[in-house]
Amino acid sequence: MSAKNYLATYAKSFNWAGFFLPKDTYKKCSALYDFCRVADNIADDENTITVKKEKFKKFKDNFENKNFTDPIIKNIWDLIYENNISTKIIHDLFDGINSDIKEQVKLNTKKELLIYSYRVAGTVGLMMAKILKVDKKNSLKSAINLGIAMQLTNISRDVIEDLNNNRIYIDQNFENIKSTIQLSEEFYENSFYSIKEIPLSFRFSILVARRVYRKIGYKILNKKNFENYKKSGKIYVNNTEKIVET
């Protein structure tokens, strides 16, 4: 697997949940996250749009051409082969990331918000489920729902940061933030129904990730208004809260 652990660096809530996975499974989940993070970082870095498009095209070409000199590419293809992951899921992820490589991003409807959330996060939940040996259709749908729920949490948390990057996924007022958290709750609830289908050795880790990430939404709601929300900076779950939620 890749030398740099992006999961530990960028996704501390997920990394905490990953602590409860078997070591080999954690490595596979980490390799998946590495691939998604490297792709996403291209859209998020400070280069010009032209440079970002060139870098993203090169990354996609490396994937399509199976450039195994890049460990990130080799690892994702190993996961695809081992877990029977459809490349359509990867292409859906690419579509989501590509939609962020613009001078300005603006989503106008709930449908657009949910499509975007599926592409950049529901896909990841689906691939993660395949790694965790989940194969029933309803269970895979629950994995997509959990990914969407977490992305809606991200969007609700990062309104100011996204605006500074010329991205408007939801309007900048607390009512919209609150309604997005409420929408995420529907997806968190729907993600729970098939949890029993996850193999027992993996189940606790997914429950922890779900509880810890959901907690972010509750903390956002506790800000009560947009002024408090703006003053709070990036809202996260601290280590003590993670232990409590676990």
Describe each model-derived feature in a short phrase.
Residues 1-152, 156-246:
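Catalytic cores of Mg2+-dependent Asp-rich isoprenoid enzymes
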